From Swiss-Prot:
Gene Ontology biological process terms from the UniProt entry: virion assembly
Organism expressing this protein natively: Psittacid herpesvirus 1 (isolate Amazon parrot/-/97-0001/1997)
Location of the region described as Interaction with large tegument protein in the Swiss-Prot/TrEMBL record: 476-970
Keywords in alphabetical order: Host cytoplasm, Host Golgi apparatus, Host nucleus, Virion, Virion tegument
Designated name of the protein: Inner tegument protein
Length: 970
C-alpha cells in the first residue's frame, strides 16, 4: 500500500476504503463468497504494523466510521472471515495505540485512553446493532483486561508520584518488581500492546531510579557507629540525584536527610573529614598540594553545612584559583574566602581513606580521586594490608552479583554498588581519573590491586546503573542492552586489560542484567490468538493462518522468541488444521448433490491462471472452481501451487528488478498485499506457505514504505533481512513448482533465485547501506578527531604558557610578591603579583588541563565505541565481497563495491585506532610530565610557605627550623 500521509488519520483512511469497497460490492450484487477486496481490507486492519496515535483514536468521526465500515464489510465477506474480523478488530486497533507516557501527565493520559477505548467499544456495539441487528459481545473479556490494566497502571503511577510514601512503605528495601510484576502477570494477553510495553518501560525507569536513592537515603538518615558514614552517604546521594541537570527533576532533598546531615556533622566528624591548611605546620606528603575540584566541593559542603553546595556552589565561592591576568581581582576574592574559612581542605591519604568501614571506602570521593591522581609513596604495612583486603573484598563481592541477583533481584546488585560508593556518577569520576592520570603499578602490589578493584567496580557499576535505567522485560531492552555494554564495558576494555582483567570478567558479573523478555506471556498471546481464530467454523483457515503466522513472525523478529520453538509450534498447528479441513471436506462430499458443476480441467485451469491480472479483481471462475465438489482438496491445492509457481514468482521477479526507492517499494507492497490476500475470501489453500513469506517480505520493507526509515539510511542488517525474505519467498515458489502435476510443469519456465548480483533492488539496498555505513563512520571519526585535536591544542597552549612563565626571571620581595621579567638580561618587567596569585594561576592551568584531558578521554571512548560496529560491518562486507551469504554458503562472485567498502572499513578502523592511541599517548604524557612538574613546583612552594609560617613565632628554636624543613618529622 502507498505510504499514508502524515496528517491523515490512519483509522479514517481505512474507514473510507472499507466504505467505498462495501458500496462497490453492494452495487455489483456480490455475495458472501465473492468479496475479495473487503476481505483484503479486513486483513490490512488485523495485520497492520502502523502506530495509531492516541489522538487518532480519540477522533470521534474516524472511530465511528471505522466501526461502521468493519461491520458493513462483515455483511459481505464469507461468514467465517467476518467472525474472525469481528473478534479481533478492536484488539488489532488497541494493540497499536501509542500513548505519550513520557509527557508526565499520567493520570490524564490514563483517563484519555480509558475514555477513547470505551467509546471505541461503544462505536462497535452501535455499528453491530445497526448492520447486523445484534449487540457486540465479542469484546467483553478484552474490555475488562484493558480496564483492569489501566487501573493497575494508575495505581503504580500513584506510588511513583507519592515518592515519600513509596519509600516509607518500602521499609528496609525498595522492590520495583512488586509494583511492575502485576502489569504482566495479571494481563499477559496485553503484553504485545505498544502502550503496555512503553508504559512498563517508562514506569520501570522511574521506579528503578529510586532503588539506589532509597538505599543511600536510609544510610544517610540512620545512626552508624562511624559518624562519617552517614555524612558520606548523604554527599553521595546529593552528587548522584540532586544536580540541577539530573532527571527526574521533581525529586527534592528530603527534609529528614537535611536534618540528619546537620545532626551527624558534629565537630568531631568535621575535624576527621577536613583540616585547616593554614593551621597545619606542614603539608602532609599524602595531602594534595592544591586540592582537586572534588576536594574543594566536598570541603565547602562540610564547612558550610550545606548539602546542595556540592552540586550548586555559591556564586562567590571559587575552587580553581585565578589566571594571572585577573590576579588583582582574585586577590580580593581570596581575602573574602579566607575570612570565611576557605583555607579548609579535605583529608586525603590512605589513613583517611580507611577511616571508614571497608564497604564504604568508595564513598570518600576526594580521597579516592587523590589516590588516582597522585599514587601515595611509602605506605605503612598496615595500610598495604588494608589496600589488599579492600581489593579482595570488592572483587569477591562483584563476583557474587549473579548469585545475589538470582536470590534478591537486580535491585540488590544496585543497592550493593550504591552503598559501596559506586554510584553512576562516582563510577564515571573514577574511570575518568584512571583513564587520564593513573600511573601503572607493578602487578601484585597492594596499590595495583586497589586500583584494579576500583576500576573493575567502576566499569561494572557504570554498566549496571546504565542498564538498570531501563526495564529489562520489554521488547526495547535488548537493543539498549547491547548499546550500553558497548559504551561502558567495551569502551573501557583497555583499562581492564591494564589491570590484568578481561571483558568476560565484567560481563559475567553483569549476567543478571541480560534481557529477560516475558516469553511465557508472549506464548500465552500466541496460543490464545490461535484458539480464538480456530474456534471459528471451517472456511477461514487461511485467513486465520495469516493472523497467527504474522504474530509468530513478530514474536521471533521483534519479541525475541525462539525461532525453532515457534516453527515447531506452527508445524504442529498446521497438522491439526489440515486434519480438521479434511474431515470437513469429507462431510461436504457426502452431502453435496451430484449435479454440481465438476472442477476445471487442465486447459481451463491454465487459462484461468494465465488470465489473472496482478492487482486486479479475482475472476468469478476462481470461486466456482474452488467450491465445486469434484475439484475439492486436490484440485484446490493444484490451483494454489500453480498460482504460487506462476503468479507469485512473477511478482517476485518483478520485485527483484525494481529500484530500492520509496515509491517503488510502496507499489511493491501493494502488489504483495494482493498476493497475500488472493483467494482468502474462498479459503484458497496455501501448501507452500507462500503467504507467510509474503508477510515476512512486507515486514522487511515496511519501515521504508511508511517513511520511518529513509531508503538512504538502510543498514547492511536490513539489506540482509530483505535478501533473506526474498530468498524464502523464492523457496516457497519452488516448493509449489515441484508439487505441480507433470502437465503443468512443462508450461512454466525456470526462474533464477533473487541475488544481489542480478537484482537492482538488492544491489541498491546494499549500495545504500555501504554508503551510509561509510558515511556515518567517517563523520564520527572526523568529528571525534576534530574535537580531540581542538582540546589537545588548548592543552598544549596552556602548558606552553606555563613553560614560558618558567623561562622568565622572577624576583621575590619580602611582601609576598613576585616580579616577573622577560627572559634574558635586561628584560622588560612584565608585572608584579602576589606569589599566591601566581601559584593559583598555575593551578588553574592544572585544573583546566585535567578537565581537557577528561573531555578528550570522553571523545576517545565515544570513538572507540564504534570498534565493534566497524568490525561487524567489515566482516559483513568481506562476506559479501567473497560471494558468501550470512550462513557462509557459496554464491556468485560479487561486485568490487563490497571489496572497496570492506577495504575502506579497514582504513577507517586503522585511522580510528591511530587517533585513539596517539590521543591517549599525548594526554598521558601531558599528565605524567607537564602537569606533574607544575604540581611538584607548587608543592615545593606550599612546603616552603608552611615552613615559613611555622617559623613565624616570637622565639624560634633550632628544632622548629628542622621540623619545618623536614616534613617527615611532622
Amino acid at each position: 500500500m502507498a505510504p499514508k500521509s502524515a496528517c491523515k488519520n490512519a483509522l479514517a483512511q481505512l474507514a473510507a476504503e472499507l466504505s467505498s469497497a462495501s458500496k462497490r460490492d453492494t452495487s455489483s450484487g456480490s455475495t458472501r463468497n465473492s468479496a475479495p477486496e473487503l476481505t483484503s481490507l479486513l486483513a490490512d486492519l488485523l495485520l497492520s504494523r502502523d502506530d495509531v496515535p492516541l489522538e487518532d483514536l480519540e477522533a470521534t468521526t474516524a472511530r465511528s466510521h471505522l466501526a461502521k465500515g468493519v461491520f458493513a464489510a462483515c455483511k459481505l465477506v464469507p461468514f467465517p472471515v467476518a467472525e474472525v474480523a469481528v473478534r479481533l478488530a478492536v484488539r488489532a486497533i488497541m494493540r497499536r495505540v501509542v500513548v505519550p507516557w513520557q509527557a508526565g501527565e499520567n493520570f490524564s493520559m490514563i483517563q484519555r485512553v480509558r475514555e477513547a477505548f470505551l467509546r471505541l467499544v461503544d462505536d462497535f456495539d452501535n455499528a453491530s446493532k445497526t448492520e447486523l441487528n445484534a449487540p457486540f459481545t465479542q469484546c467483553s473479556e478484552y474490555k475488562d483486561l484493558i480496564g483492569g490494566w489501566l487501573t493497575q497502571f494508575g495505581n503504580a503511577v500513584v506510588l511513583t508520584m507519592s515518592e515519600q510514601q513509596l519509600l516509607d512503605d518500602a521499609g528496609s528495601v525498595l522492590n520495583p518488581p512488586e509494583v511492575l510484576a502485576p502489569l504482566v502477570e495479571r494481563y499477559p494477553l496485553l503484553i504485545d500492546h505498544v502502550m503496555v510495553q512503553e508504559g512498563m518501560d517508562y514506569l520501570g525507569g522511574k521506579l528503578q531510579s529510586l532503588v539506589a536513592y532509597h538505599a543511600l537515603l536510609r544510610c544517610a538518615t540512620r545512626p552508624h557507629e562511624n559518624g562519617k558514614v552517614p555524612v558520606l552517604a548523604a554527599l553521595t546521594m546529593v552528587a548522584e540525584y540532586f544536580d540541577p541537570e539530573t532527571k527526574p527533576a521533581y525529586r527534592k532533598v528530603p527534609q529528614k536527610a537535611v536534618a540528619a546531615f546537620d545532626l551527624n556533622l558534629t565537630d568531631e566528624v568535621v575535624s576527621s573529614l577536613v583540616y585547616d591548611q593554614a593551621a597545619a605546620p606542614v603539608v602532609q606528603s599524602e595531602q594534595p598540594v592544591l586540592p582537586q575540584s572534588e576536594s574543594l566541593l566536598f570541603t565547602e559542603v562540610v564547612r558550610t553545612r550545606n548539602m546542595l553546595a556540592l552540586v550548586q556552589p555559591s556564586a562567590t565561592w571559587e575552587g580553581s584559583g585565578a589566571a594571572l591576568r585577573n590576579a588583582a581581582g582574585d586577590a580580593k576574592r581570596r581575602q573574602q574566602q579566607a575570612a570565611r574559612g576557605a583555607g579548609m581542605a579535605w583529608r586525603c591519604g590512605v589513613d583517611a581513606l580507611f577511616s571508614v568501614p571497608m564497604e564504604h571506602v568508595a564513598m570518600n570521593v576526594p580521597a579516592v580521586m587523590q589516590m588516582l591522581h597522585e599514587p601515595p609513596t611509602d605506605i605503612p604495612a598496615e595500610y598495604e594490608r588494608a589496600l589488599s583486603l579492600y581489593a579482595t573484598d570488592t572483587i569477591d563481592a562483584i563476583a557474587k552479583f549473579p548469585d545475589l541477583a538470582a536470590s534478591s533481584g537486580t535491585e540488590a546488585v544496585i543497592r550493593s554498588l550504591a552503598l559501596r560508593g559506586f554510584t553512576k556518577t562516582n563510577c564515571e569520576r573514577y574511570l575518568f581519573a584512571a583513564e587520564a592520570f593513573l600511573e601503572p603499578q607493578a602487578p601484585g602490589t597492594p596499590l595495583h590491586d586497589f586500583y584494579a578493584a576500583v576500576i573493575y567496580a567502576s566499569v561494572v557499576g557504570l554498566a549496571a546503573h546504565s542498564l538498570y535505567a531501563y526495564n529489562q522485560h520489554t521488547i526495547f531492552y535488548p537493543e539498549k542492552y547491547s548499546r550500553v555494554l558497548k559504551k561502558t564495558v567495551e569502551a573501557h576494555a583497555y583499562l581492564l586489560d591494564m589491570m590484568g582483567l578481561a571483558i568476560s570478567d565484567a560481563l559475567i558479573s553483569l549476567r543478571a542484567f541480560a534481557p529477560k523478555p516475558p516469553h511465557q506471556a508472549f506464548r500465552t498471546v500466541r496460543d490464545t490468538l490461535a484458539a480464538v481464530v480456530d474456534s471459528v467454523e471451517t472456511g477461514a483457515e487461511e485467513f486465520s493462518d495469516l493472523i497467527v503466522s504474522d504474530y509468530v513472525q513478530r514474536l521471533t523478529a521483534d519479541f525475541y522468541g525462539g525461532i525453532h520453538e515457534n516453527e515447531q509450534w506452527l508445524s504442529e498447528r498446521d497438522a491439526a488444521i489440515r486434519q480438521r479441513m479434511e474431515i470437513a471436506a469429507a462431510g461436504r462430499r457426502e452431502t453435496d448433490s451430484a449435479g454440481r458443476r465438476p472442477g476445471l480441467g487442465f486447459h481451463e485451469l491454465a487459462a484461468l491462471v494465465q488470465g489473472l491480472q496482478i492487482g486486479g479483481k479475482e475472476p468469478k471462475a476462481v470461486v466456482e472452481y474452488a467450491t465445486a465438489p469434484a475439484g475439492a482438496a486436490s484440485a484446490g491445492a493444484t490451483f494454489s501451487a500453480l498460482f504460487a509457481a506462476a503468479i507469485v514468482r512473477d511478482v517476485m521477479e518483478g520485485a527483484a528488478a525494481i529500484p530500492f526507492e520509496a515509491d517503488a517499494l510502496a507499489r511493491l507492497n501493494k502488489a504483495l498485499s494482493w498476493l497475500r490476500d488472493f483467494g482468502l475470501s474462498w479459503n484458497m489453500p496455501d501448501g507452500s506457505h507462500y503467504r507467510r513469506r509474503v508477510i515476512a517480505l512486507q515486514a522487511a520493507i515496511h519501515p521504508f514504505v511508511t517513511g520511518k526509515i529513509g531508503v538512504d539510511a538502510v543498514t547492511v542488517k536490513q539489506a540482509r533481512a530483505l535478501e533473506t525474505a526474498m530468498g524464502d519467498l523464492y523457496a516457497a515458489c519452488e516448493y509449489s513448482f515441484q508439487a505441480l502435476p507433470p502437465p503443468y510443469v512443462g508450461g512454466l519456465r525456470k526462474a533464477a533465485a533473487p541475488s544481489r548480483q542480478h537484482s537492482p533492488l538488492l544491489a541498491q539496498a546494499y549500495t545504500n547501506a555501504a554508503m551510509g555505513d561509510l558515511g556515518v563512520l567517517t563523520k564520527t571519526l572526523a568529528k571525534s578527531a576534530e574535537e580531540i585535536s581542538k582540546t589537545v591544542r588548548d592543552m598544549v597552549s596552556r602548558l606552553l604558557s606555563a613553560r614560558d612563565l618558567f623561562s622568565r626571571r622572577a624576583t621575590a620581595s619580602d611582601k609576598n610578591a613576585v616580579t616577573i621579567d622577560a627572559a634574558g638580561p635586561g628584560g622588560t618587567v612584565l608585572g608584579t603579583w602576589e606569589d599566591e596569585s601566581v601559584m593559583s594561576g598555575l593551578w588553574k592551568t592544572v585544573n583546566f588541563t585535567e578537565a581537557a584531558i577528561r573531555n578528550t578521554e570522553r571523545a576517545v571512548r565515544e570513538l572507540e565505541a564504534t570498534k565493534r560496529e566497524t568490525q561487524d560491518l567489515e566482516e559483513s562486507y568481506w562476506q559479501l565481497a567473497s560471494g558468501r551469504d550470512g550462513a557462509g554458503n557459496a554464491a556468485q562472485p560479487s561486485e568490487s563495491l563490497y571489496q572497496q567498502v570492506a577495504a575502506e572499513l579497514v582504513e577507517i578502523a586503522d585511522a580510528r585506532n591511530a587517533v585513539v592511541v596517539r590521543a591517549r599517548s599525548l594526554y598521558r604524557a601531558i599528565a605524567g610530565t607537564g602537569l606533574k612538574r607544575i604540581r611538584t613546583f607548587v608543592k615545593a612552594w606550599r612546603l616552603f610557605l608552611k615552613a615559613e609560617r611555622s617559623l613565624a613565632k616570637q622565639v624560634v628554636q633550632q628544632q622548629d627550623l628542622i621540623d619545618a624543613l623536614d616534613p617527615s618529622r611532622s
